[in-house]
């Protein structure tokens, strides 16, 4: 006899998403995490497309959604700007702490509990050992609890830093992205929040050794309209490595950032964490871990691989060429709010309208992804 049907290690988005499925299936489960409070520290900007909200049946209650998105701006340091406008919501920005706390309601969670080791069906923690038929590892990008995870290379990690600043809502469009010399391998973002607050953040590839705090400060000096009183900050690592083909090892399932389920082209992790967590939770509820492996390979892995290939092109292209993208996109016309369609369409447009970008895509071995 086992203590639990399933033990979930990690009470972030992926672990909580798996927990919700198990809870609704009436399974005997527990979620273990070393932190003191759900939703803290914040590990996400909270942005996600309408497509994935619908696909994953994510809640959009006003209490947990900071903003709804209908227009997006993409620009560079030279002032080149492309704006995509829609007559319907195409995305949301969650209040991330409230979102995770909403997911956690009613779940069997034990905080202040660090998992030290996992061996077969036994989980060793700082509060003693427990056993489970199945185990879901949702303990983040630097987890040491599975042999699947190698030490991530610096080129496969983005360092994200964000400041929530006192600023009025934008009058031109809802959210903005800058491809900037201040953000090598990444970008700068401006997301709306509640109560005259906006989230100004930056992601830089770790290999660049760029200090994201200093880089965001330098960027702000170039864009003084973004200056505002800082209410709070977040910083976190974002894994953008090649997705693993195998995520199930016997009775152990790997989800979320621990499985590199981040959309590497944008650094967006909320959709991959939710998707992988739900798939693993469903498999665990049916006591069939291999079901998760099959659905990972057929559903999630191909999407993650496409985004990784886009990221690979960006990392092949010199930064000064990346800065040309907003200019090239001036002739791009978005058709849907589905980012599974629009991001590859956008990348194809860039490749077809720039001979040098085509060359870099060929060098990266990624042109087949867009034809």
Question: What label would you give each PLM region?
Answer:
Residues 320-371:
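C-terminal auxiliary extensions adjacent to catalytic cores
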Residues 11, 105-227, 244, 260-262:
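Predominantly flavin-linked oxidoreductase catalytic cores and closely associated redox partners
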Residues 1-14:
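Beta1/beta-strand and adjacent pyrophosphate-binding region of the FAD-binding site
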Residues 208-286, 290-291:
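FAD/FMN-dependent oxidoreductases across multiple families
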Residues 23-43:
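Glycine-rich FAD pyrophosphate-binding loop
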Residues 14, 37, 142:
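Conserved Rossmann-like nucleotide-cofactor binding loop
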Residues 48, 52-101:
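A conserved beta-strand/loop capping segment in the N-terminal third of enzymes
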Residues 282-320:
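Active-site-proximal substrate-binding core of FAD-dependent oxidoreductases
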């Amino acid at each position: 006899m086992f203590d639990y049907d399933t033990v979930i290690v990690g009470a972030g988005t992926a672990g909580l998403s798996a927990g919700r499925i198990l809870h609704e299936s009436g399974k005997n489960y527990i979620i273990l995490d070393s932190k003191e409070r759900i939703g803290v520290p914040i590990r996400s900007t909270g942005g996600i497309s309408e497509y994935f909200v619908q696909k994953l049946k994510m809640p959009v209650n006003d209490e947990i959604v900071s903003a709804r998105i209908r227009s997006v701006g993409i620009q560079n340091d030279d002032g080149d700007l492309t704006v995509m406008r829609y007559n319907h919501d195409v995305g949301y920005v969650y209040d991330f702490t409230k979102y995770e706390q909403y997911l956690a309601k009613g779940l069997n969670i034990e905080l202040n509990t660090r998992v030290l080791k996992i061996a077969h069906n036994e989980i060793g923690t700082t509060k003693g050992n427990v056993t489970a038929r199945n185990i879901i590892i949702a303990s983040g990008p630097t987890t040491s609890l599975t042999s699947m995870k190698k030490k991530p290379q610096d080129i496969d990690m983005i360092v994200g830093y964000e400041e929530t600043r006192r600023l009025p809502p934008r009058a031109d469009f809802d959210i903005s992205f800058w491809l900037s010399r201040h953000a090598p391998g990444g970008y700068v973002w401006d997301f709306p929040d509640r109560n005259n607050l906006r989230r100004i953040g930056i992601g830089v590839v770790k290999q660049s050794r760029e200090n994201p705090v200093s880089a965001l400060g330098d960027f702000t000096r170039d864009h003084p309209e973004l200056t505002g009183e800082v209410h709070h900050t977040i910083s976190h690592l974002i894994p953008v490595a090649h997705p693993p083909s195998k995520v199930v090892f016997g009775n152990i399932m790997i989800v979320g950032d621990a499985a590199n389920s981040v959309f590497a082209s944008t650094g967006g992790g909320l959709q991959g964490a939710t998707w992988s967590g739900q798939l693993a939770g469903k498999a665990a509820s049916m006591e069939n871990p291999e079901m998760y492996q099959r659905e990972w390979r057929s559903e999630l892995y191909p999407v993650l691989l496409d985004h990784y290939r886009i990221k690979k092109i960006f990392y092949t292209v010199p930064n000064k060429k990346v800065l040309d993208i907003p200019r090239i996109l001036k002739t791009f016309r978005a058709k849907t709010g589905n980012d599974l369609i629009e991001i590859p369409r956008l990348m194809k447009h860039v490749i077809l309208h720039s001979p040098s970008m085509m060359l870099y895509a060929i060098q990266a071995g990624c042109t087949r992804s867009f034809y």
